[in-house]
Amino acid sequence: MSLITDIIAREVLDSRGNPTLEAEVITELGGFGRGMVPSGASTGEHEAVELRDGDKSRFGGKGTTKAVANVNDAIAKALVGKFDVTDQRAIDQAMIELDGTENKGNLGANAILAVSIAAARAAADELGVPLFSYLGGANSYVLPTPMMNVINGGAHSANKVDFQEFMIMPVGAPTVKEAIRYGSETFHALKKLLEADGKATSVGDEGGFAPDFADNEEPLKYLIRAIEAAGYKPGKDIAIAVDVASSELYDAETKTYKLRWSTGEEFTTPEFIKYLEDLADRYPIISIEDPIDENEWEDWAAITAELGKKVQLVGDDFFVTNTQYLEKGINMGAANSILIKVNQIGTLTETFEAIEMAKEAGYTAIVSHRSGETEDTTISDLVVATNAGQIKTGSLSRTDRIAKYNQLIRIEELLDTTAKYKGIHSFYNLSAAAREVIENK
């Protein structure tokens, strides 16, 4: 048993230059752990509360000194000298009870999560094992298939593209290291194509390119060209995923979806489902995130009934990593996958519970970054610890994104011959026939 002897928090900056929170946990046997918290650009309305100061004279109101004070005062008093650092569940539960709200609005999910991560890292450090081994044990061996966001739109950029993310997934690679190479080569091939056509190659929050396009289909055409230019076969070697972030397009009063940044077209829900189905039929799209507004549960069930056998339908804003929402979705047959963002729920314990529930229901779980990231690589260890099988952590540029990929390479090397990269088979929520169709598009 090794008690927590000190907890320290400070305000630092994320990848967008906005303040965020970092916490450190120290144990009586010298264990040390540090956790940094990301933040999102488009956030679900049901996410746990990210506590900000609201003082407009400082960081435009985005300061985190209140959350820092909560760690250094209330949380430290509750945990220091009272908890064994290896008792992650008890530590997380104590902070949840101390907060006393359903959405962590008192202490702030950012304050609680930073300590949750730091405690896990301190325990791993004290035991002398990698974080993924500490969190997952001896059965942690699956390296994830990456979702690489190479074209940004929507809230993640200033262009005229409605969909928030256009991603490539190296489903045919033999290892995660090779998958990262596939992605890097395709990313650079895409850059050359954009430059040749006179399009901008500046990047958005997540490291992807953010040029203007005529509509939401043009980026898909560029992805196909880039995959082929890099020497790979679309579908078989590299599939495509999109994040529609449809809550940004939805008008709850008229119950329509409007392509507000591109053509201005409006769709009823059945029309919008048909629009997405048409794109999935014509391109090797294997995954669609948030295709329906986060509050329209019946419509989620409808699109799942229509497309759920052949395309991964991911709930991000829809589920917000919350087991209550996930359980409701499972019972309704809504979605077939959940995006896992640790700061949406606020502790590692609750994150593990969401991943476990998803797997038991046959849903995939995709461990994800946020648009405002840090150099913290916890999600790389988390995805291997849980054998989740898929990770979404940005493009092949910006150190805050590359840090996660580099950590996966290190983990694969540590696991050596026991490591397994499942590629297309990480989509266990799709039928074998559906996977074959995507590979042959």
From Swiss-Prot:
Its EC number is 4.2.1.11. This is Enolase. PROSITE patterns: ENOLASE (PS00164). Keywords: Cytoplasm, Glycolysis, Lyase, Magnesium, Metal-binding, Secreted. Its main location: cytoplasm. Mg(2+) binds at D243, E289, D316. Disulfide bonds: none annotated. Binds a second Mg(2+) ion via substrate during catalysis. Its cofactor is Mg(2+). Pfam families: Enolase_C (PF00113), Enolase_N (PF03952). GO terms for molecular function: magnesium ion binding; phosphopyruvate hydratase activity. Catalyzes the reversible conversion of 2-phosphoglycerate (2-PG) into phosphoenolpyruvate (PEP). It is essential for the degradation of carbohydrates via glycolysis. Pathway: Carbohydrate degradation; glycolysis; pyruvate from D-glyceraldehyde 3-phosphate: step 4/5. GO terms for biological process: glycolytic process. It is found in: Cytoplasm; Secreted; Cell surface. (2R)-2-phosphoglycerate binds at Q164, K341, R370, S371, K392. SMART domains: Enolase_C, Enolase_N. One of its GO terms (cellular component) is phosphopyruvate hydratase complex. It catalyses: (2R)-2-phosphoglycerate = phosphoenolpyruvate + H2O. Belongs to the enolase family. The active site is at E206, K341.
